[in-house]
């Protein structure tokens, strides 16, 4: 029983090490006016785990920094699509 608790304690202590901050650039071609980036930024900022969002109208892209244990690229692209701006990972 003691070994079980020791193993669980070790796993809990190491778990935060596996978390990683990711940065992804999303292409958002549907942004056609200067107000569009505001909507896209709000949508992405609401995704749990997102720590930073920079949206550029000129390049029609969003650079998003997020905790990959709480958010994913799929959640980010869903958030923009739900806001009316489909996006994809920029290559």
UniProtKB/Swiss-Prot annotation:
InterPro entries: Heavy-metal-associated_CS, HMA_dom, HMA_dom_sf, MerP, MerP/CopZ
UniProt cross-references to Pfam families, sorted A to Z: HMA
A GO cellular component entry from the record: periplasmic space
Binding site for Hg(2+): 33, 36
Domain (HMA): residue spans on this chain: 22-88
Primary location group: periplasm
Keyword hit for Signal: yes
One of the record's GO molecular function terms: mercury ion binding
Gene3D superfamilies in the cross-refs: 3.30.70.100
Keywords: Mercuric resistance, Mercury, Metal-binding, Periplasm, Plasmid, Signal, Transposable element
Protein family: Belongs to the MerP family.
Function: Involved in mercury resistance. Acts as a mercury scavenger that specifically binds to a mercuric ion in the periplasm and probably passes it to the cytoplasmic mercuric reductase MerA via the mercuric transport protein MerT.
Oligomeric and partner information: Monomer.
Protein name per Swiss-Prot or TrEMBL: Mercuric transport protein periplasmic component
